[in-house]
Amino acid sequence: MPRRKQQAPRRSAAYVPEEELKAAEIDEEHVEDDGLSLDIQESEYMCNEETEIKEAQSYQNSPVSSATNQDAGYGSPFSESSDQLAHFKGSSSREEKEDPQCPDSVSYPQDSLAQIKAVYANLFSESCWSSLALDLKKSGSTTSTNDASQKESSAPTPTPPTCPVSTTGPTTSTPSTSCSSSTSHSSTTSTSSSSGYDWHQAALAKTLQQTSSYGLLPEPSLFSTVQLYRQNNKLYGSVFTGASKFRCKDCSAAYDTLVELTVHMNETGHYRDDNRDKDSEKTKRWSKPRKRSLMEMEGKEDAQKVLKCMYCGHSFESLQDLSVHMIKTKHYQKVPLKEPVPAITKLVPSTKKRALQDLAPPCSPEPAGMAAEVALSESAKDQKAANPYVTPNNRYGYQNGASYTWQFEARKAQILKCMECGSSHDTLQQLTAHMMVTGHFLKVTTSASKKGKQLVLDPVVEEKIQSIPLPPTTHTRLPASSIKKQPDSPAGSTTSEEKKEPEKEKPPVAGDAEKIKEESEDSLEKFEPSTLYPYLREEDLDDSPKGGLDILKSLENTVSTAISKAQNGAPSWGGYPSIHAAYQLPGTVKPLPAAVQSVQVQPSYAGGVKSLSSAEHNALLHSPGSLTPPPHKSNVSAMEELVEKVTGKVNIKKEERPPEKEKSSLAKAASPIAKENKDFPKTEEVSGKPQKKGPEAETGKAKKEGPLDVHTPNGTEPLKAKVTNGCNNLGIIMDHSPEPSFINPLSALQSIMNTHLGKVSKPVSPSLDPLAMLYKISNSMLDKPVYPATPVKQADAIDRYYYENSDQPIDLTKSKNKPLVSSVADSVASPLRESALMDISDMVKNLTGRLTPKSSTPSTVSEKSDADGSSFEEALDELSPVHKRKGRQSNWNPQHLLILQAQFASSLRETTEGKYIMSDLGPQERVHISKFTGLSMTTISHWLANVKYQLRRTGGTKFLKNLDTGHPVFFCNDCASQFRTASTYISHLETHLGFSLKDLSKLPLNQIQEQQNVSKVLTNKTLGPLGATEEDLGSTFQCKLCNRTFASKHAVKLHLSKTHGKSPEDHLIYVTELEKQ
């Protein structure tokens, strides 16, 4: 006994393998059973009880050894509880042993039984066992010896067989049943072997004991409540779920509870008989299988949540079972289509049902079922919130899988709806067939825009909508706040926006505000994609406040709702692969990045709620908007202010796509500003849901033209246009306060614009100063989204830019305020240093990279401030790999590459057939290269090996093509010149390097470097003619970053990309065209 005490603390229960725990439990049960068994064999066994107990102790050494302790130790990290349990168990077992040791006990099993009963009575006298003790005594007095023996055998692990105790939840089998099964079990086992305790029985006892003791034990006396709780969950996790989890391995019969399974196994004999071997063998033999069975039960619990037939809700233990089921029942054909409607009726609260009914009927006459759709989606949302089956605690929803069904059914009418005619369908196949037959899939975009226009313009609907107050939660994209109101305060814009939303939706008048909002979102989503300039004209904007309906407002409303909807992930439209696709404007130069969406446009407008990323994005966008703001303010502080403002007003997002459209128009404008604006829209999109923006951009642009007052449509709510953020146009920028952001929007967006607008906008004159170009672009963009801010005549000029093209977005500011642009022009007018712009662009880039799931601007934007003419090597050092373009730009020093390429070319050997054979560079050459370049020998070897691999595999690499054909073409990475022979190629590279390869081994490093510097000027001049294989023979091009000259635009682009990590689109900014002398 003392030995047991000493050893108990050695291992905390938490660290004892489950198998040992279980084995120990079984052993202990056997030990206690020995005294309780009625068999004569058992009486003999009792003679050896002490030795047996000692043996068992070897298994019980760990604190878990005691049955109770075992349970407690199942997952308990507390060694104290284990020790406590071990000690307790030790004392109890000591008592047990002492009793059986009496000679009487040997010959009189009944006596020993009585003694053991007494021992257990004492043991149960503990407060925690009070109810168990009562049960024990009751059953002891009322049951037969068989029952008594069974009860006591299970007592150590209070098991259900004791009827009263077994009344725990699902395992409450009637006392007679459990007792009888246990009795038969124990008798069977006892006859087969002295220790015969069936592991099924043990498992059952353990389970029941845990459930009962969990309720009984207020303190962690025998079991740790934590352990019990955890184990209880593991064993019973699905007992109450109705999923048949306990399966008989022999016949696959499924039972809801372990008790039923155990009874079945006992009655049918579907279990292994070898589990009744002697204790030592038994423990070893069954420890793994028992552990495995328990682990299976636990794993299956999780698996069944996934391996569930979505039609009938049956759970399966394996994917194979589920597959067989689906194949045999053909349920896989019915899953998304015919789901049990009863599930919906059961699960949807009556109030929800009523709401659904109420909402559906009022469908407004407009697009058939639109109102209904909105109502449905709204009610579906409510259901989602109210549905008791979808609580956070019950993530898996209705146990039989009906949750999927009812959720789908509840929204089916909304989901499976034709966006053209509004007809709902029962199945996706039907909807698809309908779209194909009617050709509505082609008309969706245009018809949606028409509908959107109708909705917007219908005065009756407008009035109705206006009559319904929308909660400020609707996205306050209001920056485009109603044109009439043109509220300067974000609150005002919010209100107007709310109004707009309903107006545009002009869905069921009767529906509650939420319903309308939902509908508006739906309709927005549907219409926005199609609401293009063709439908909304500037003329429309002029009479915009028709019947009290403000087109701009409604547009804003629509966009905001769409954005919020997109954000919430409840798409109501049907025919688009993605939100972005749904809202891409045909006129926009580039689709908004899907990532943009993630930046929330949500009801953060309410104010600070807006997520930081969104706010930051907005801030970034803002900066463009506030071109006028003083550049002297520190970039960081300015950005912070912008972020704050943006956070305060989510309207920024409302700006929507207009910026996108502006993008395209800007591109045409060819002014750098256009570029900037373009970028803005992208950024905005990133922050705000692009999907909404797109449509709003379209409609918003049109609206903007009409009621500039609604400048908010830009998303700069009332921005107060003080700053007349030309970028407001990028309106997304800011819903933020009318105060202009202090960062020059041009500088903040320059990098972004450069990246995205380079292709779209062709500067009027390539030689035009980049700042001037940006200015123009921003002006054009600004005038479009002009917020009713400072009136600027520039807006007119911009209008010209944009409106020359019918594709250009409508100038929403045209009809109302044109002053907006002026301030922007002023701000732009003050020339900003290119380096300053770059710094800001870096800031923007960092922010966008961090905030937006996917920055709308390519990483190439990360153009560090290389503008100050630092050498290309320095520029390379400054550019972190993160900022570099991965595919086309390498981290290699261009000079090192030239040396390696020249050496490799010199190592090629020409055969008599005219083909070239690659021969390796000798160690000496490698050493020379290493000494000169500072590259390690390993790096050089890797480079050579990579080149050889590429040549063998594809016959070419970056600087050498067609080697395998016998007609190799060598390319100069620096100037893009092509050469047919290795010798001319090497000599050309040497002109770049400023020294001969032969000198590499002879000249000291410092001398070579000096020679390089001296020859650099000559090289630049001579390279012109050498590399001028392209069209521009009349001029040379100089890289502003490193002052090198090149013979062609292509060469400069290559150089910018490879050496400086700049996008070729940026060549206008970093390249100077020089007349040849």
From Swiss-Prot:
Biased composition (Acidic residues): 26-36
Polar residues bias: start-end ranges: 57-71, 139-152, 853-862
C2H2-type zinc finger locations on the chain: 246-270, 307-331, 416-440, 970-992, 1037-1060
GO cellular component, one term: nucleus
Molecular function as annotated in GO: DNA binding; DNA-binding transcription factor activity, RNA polymerase II-specific; zinc ion binding
Protein location: Nucleus
Region (Disordered): 1-109, 139-195, 269-298, 467-549, 647-720, 848-873
Compositional bias annotation for Basic and acidic residues: 269-284, 496-528, 647-665, 675-708
Cystine pairings recorded for this chain: none
Positions where Phosphoserine occurs in the chain: 765
InterPro entries: HD (IPR001356), Teashirt_fam (IPR027008), Znf_C2H2_type (IPR013087)
Domain of life, source organism: Eukaryota
Keyword Nucleotidyltransferase: no
DNA-binding residues: 885-955
Record's compositionally biased regions (Low complexity): 164-195
Tissues showing expression: Expressed in brain; strongly reduced in post-mortem elderly subjects with Alzheimer disease.
Record key words, sorted: Developmental protein, DNA-binding, Homeobox, Metal-binding, Nucleus, Phosphoprotein, Repeat, Repressor, Transcription, Transcription regulation, Zinc, Zinc-finger
Transmembrane segments: none
Known partners and oligomeric status: Interacts (via homeobox domain) with APBB1 (via PID domain 1).
Pathology noted in the entry: Aural atresia, congenital: A rare anomaly of the ear that involves some degree of failure of the development of the external auditory canal. The malformation can also involve the tympanic membrane, ossicles and middle ear space. The inner ear development is most often normal. Different CAA forms are known. CAA type I is characterized by bony or fibrous atresia of the lateral part of the external auditory canal and an almost normal medial part and middle ear. CAA type II is the most frequent type and is characterized by partial or total aplasia of the external auditory canal.
Function text: Probable transcriptional regulator involved in developmental processes. May act as a transcriptional repressor (Potential).
Entry protein name: Teashirt homolog 1
Species this protein is from: Homo sapiens (Human)
